[in-house]
C-alpha cells in the first residue's frame, strides 16, 4: 500500500525546470524523473546553522543530518511557498526567506531542482520546535563543526545537504575575497 507521502502530487519538470506534467511522488521517485525541492538554512545571530536529523521513518536518507528544513514543492506551488510551509511543518517557525541559489537536478540532489533559502540574523534565535514525525533531533552547529564532521563522516549527512552546503560555503568564501 502506498503511503500518504508517496501519493502527494508533484510537478514533473524538464532539465531546465519547466513544468511538463504532474505525477504522484512515489511514481516520480521510482521513474527517477526531474522534480522540485526546497531547502532552508536557518542561522542564529551567532552565525550557527541549525541542522535537523531526519526521522528514521523517512523513505529517503533516514537518520541523516539535513538542512534546517527541506521538502518537495507540491504541484502548482512556488519554491518560496514550499520553503515557508516546510519551515513551519518541520521546525515550527515562520520567517522571512531569502533566496540564495538553485541547483540543477542531478543524482546527488535526488533528481530534484533544489532552491536554497536562508533565514539569518536578529530575531532568529527563537528555538525551533522539531516535529517528531519529521525530525529525530535538531540543533545549531558552528560552521567549523559541520565542515569537520563532513570531512570525517560524510555519510552522516544527506547527499543533497552535502551538495548545497559545499556550494553555499564556496559562494560565501568567494564573496569574502
Indicate residue ranges for each PLM-predicted region.
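A short, polar/proline- and glycine-enriched secondary-structure boundary/capping micro-motif
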Residues: 31-33, 60-64, 139-140
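Short, surface-exposed beta-strand-loop junctions and turns on beta-sheet-rich folds
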Residues: 27, 57-59, 155-156
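Charged phosphate-binding loop/patch that engages nucleotide di/tri-phosphates or the phosphate backbone
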Residues: 156-177
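Unchanged
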Residues: 71-157
